[in-house]
Amino acid sequence: PLELSSAASDVYKRQLVYPTGLIGTGIFVYILFNFSLLGDMIINGYFFIMSIYGWYYWSRKKDDVFINNVSRLENKEYTQLILLALGSLIFIYFVYVQFDKWNSWTAYVDNITTAIFFVAMWLMARRKIESWIFWIIGDLITVPLYFYKGLTISSLQYIIFTVLAILGYISWKKILLKTNHQ
């Protein structure tokens, strides 16, 4: 429930996403560790840190007006995005090897989704509309992974996350269109 309220807050650009996200990620880290999904466990630790950063970033004001609005990626940010994705792929690979868990196709898939979610959260904290595309892709890959690992309820939760991410993209697209016409 906390993760769902956090995702719904993202859709509507509300800062409630951050406190609910902090609690939800802490609980989910424990669950993911027990199911040997180390990449997803680490990504939730990253979500925790990025939630603190995003809370600060989203709440910044100048003269009682929020200064960080929804925007698109700029060309210079694509390099950062690629480096973040590659860095997370390499880091999570080494975590799996260190714990001797790089032994199943699920480790490969978990590594890929972790990289996708690292990028999605970074973009979300920066209020970039492209974050929703990464959330949608990552969620769609995670649904069958969690179902296969026996995390049926979490799999269903990611179906809901996918719907919320689609709604988030639509909502933020409307905001962008509105701000570009003013």
Question: Language model features by range: what are they?
Answer:
Residues P1-A8, Y12:
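Single conserved hydrophobic/aromatic residue that forms the stacking wall/gate
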Residues L4-S6, I23-V29, A115-A120, I137-P144:
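Hydrophobic, membrane-inserted alpha-helices
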Residues S5, Y78-Y96, T162-A165:
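Hydrophobic core of alpha-helical transmembrane segments in multi-pass integral membrane proteins
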Residues Y30-D40, V97-N103, F147-I153:
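Helix-coil boundary and interhelical linker segments in multi-pass alpha-helical membrane proteins
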Residues Y46-D63:
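Membrane-water interface of transmembrane alpha-helices
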Residues F66-Q80:
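Juxtamembrane helix-capping/reentrant segments at transmembrane boundaries
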Residues F91-F99, N111-K128:
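Alpha-helical transmembrane segments in multipass membrane proteins, preferentially the mid-helix core
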Residues S131-I136, I141-N180:
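C-terminal transmembrane-bundle signature of multipass membrane proteins
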